[in-house]
């Protein structure tokens, strides 16, 4: 049984003056198994961070279900969700903003343990020391305040705080994007080690494809609030079956000379999330699009190996030979 089952998830943000809405998440469905990492990747505005916040009920869903450990948490009140809070945590993009500047490292990590209400002071202190070691910090950091730490140390504190209650799921929202390259490597290695030791599952949100490839067991690529393509990391990076996936990967320069993704142009404006097209959201930019694409919205269909693609021409994507000079996912 999956740890997390997301079905037809939607999130709209109403615009009061016009009566319209920003359609941020549009019918997203996926599972997360215990101990796995699902990489959620997309450009700015794709809806990936909104999905992450929905998973831990920092936002309320407009429609759909999020079944976590057998319970649909979208139907729970804040009070009813409280027992699940310990099992689903989030690490945020900017560690400085997510840490209270008035709390020491020890107090920041201890906070979730206090909220649990069933650990005495000695047990809390022991758990804090255990967590500091787990995220590869030193006990000398415990009395420090956030401003006395480096960005990498701050993010490690954020990770320790998220792990304090022994969660089954941690949503990582761009956890290394604000860090220096060498620090990123260290934090990623720590996250991998923690997963191996604890069996925690991650939803790893990022715009960085190389990072997603490195850390994820499976990948879901998002475009305009929906999943364009999803599958194992190996399948997605070896051969794409959605035009947006192929364009996204072909726009990335890989340090490995053996990794070559043929050019694939997407030309034109990205549709407004307020007035989404009737058919495929990519039809106005895709060289494979026809009248059927413009009129009928594609479902996320399953293919060999468990891969899924929301494209009417999924089988033709890999074979398409680009003849255009453009090679970018956001050319206008």
Kindly label every feature range from the protein language model.
Residues 16, 21, 232-332:
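Short catalytic/signature loops enriched in Gly
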Residues 64-72:
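Conserved ABC transporter NBD signature motif
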Residues 72, 122-140, 193, 249-250:
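Conserved ABC ATPase "signature" region
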Residues 166:
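Conserved catalytic motifs of ABC-family nucleotide-binding domains
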């Amino acid at each position: 049984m999956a740890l997390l089952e997301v079905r037809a998830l939607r999130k709209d943000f109403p615009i009061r003056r016009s009566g319209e809405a920003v359609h941020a998440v549009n019918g997203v469905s996926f599972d997360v198994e215990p101990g796995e990492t699902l990489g959620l990747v997309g450009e700015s505005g794709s809806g990936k961070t909104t999905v992450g916040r929905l998973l831990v009920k920092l936002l309320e869903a407009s429609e759909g279900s999020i079944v976590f450990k057998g319970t649909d948490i979208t139907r729970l009140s804040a009070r009813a969700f409280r027992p699940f809070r310990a099992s689903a945590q989030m690490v945020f993009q900017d560690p400085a903003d997510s840490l209270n500047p008035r709390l020491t490292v020890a107090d920041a990590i201890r906070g979730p343990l206090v909220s649990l209400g069933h650990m005495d002071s000695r047990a809390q202190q022991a758990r804090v020391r255990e967590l500091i070691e787990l995220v590869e910090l030193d006990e000398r950091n415990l009395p420090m305040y956030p401003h006395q730490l480096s960005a990498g140390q701050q993010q490690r504190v954020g990770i320790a705080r998220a792990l304090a209650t022994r969660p089954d799921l941690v949503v990582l929202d761009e956890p290394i994007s604000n860090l220096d390259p060498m620090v990123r490597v260290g934090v990623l290695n720590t996250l991998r080690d923690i997963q191996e030791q604890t069996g925690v599952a991650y939803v790893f949100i990022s715009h960085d494809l190389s990072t997603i490839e490195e850390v994820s067991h499976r990948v879901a690529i998002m475009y305009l609030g929906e999943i364009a393509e999803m599958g194992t990391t190996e399948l997605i990076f070896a051969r794409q079956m959605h035009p947006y996936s192929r364009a996204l990967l072909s726009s990335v320069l890989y340090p490995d000379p053996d990794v070559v993704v043929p050019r694939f142009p997407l030309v034109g404006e990205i549709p407004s999330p307020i007035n989404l097209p009737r058919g495929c959201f990519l039809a106005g930019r895709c060289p494979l699009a026809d009248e059927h694409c413009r009129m009928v919205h594609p479902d996320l269909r399953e293919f060999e190996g468990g891969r899924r693609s929301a494209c009417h021409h999924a089988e033709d994507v890999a074979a398409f030979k680009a003849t255009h000079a453009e090679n970018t996912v956001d050319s206008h």
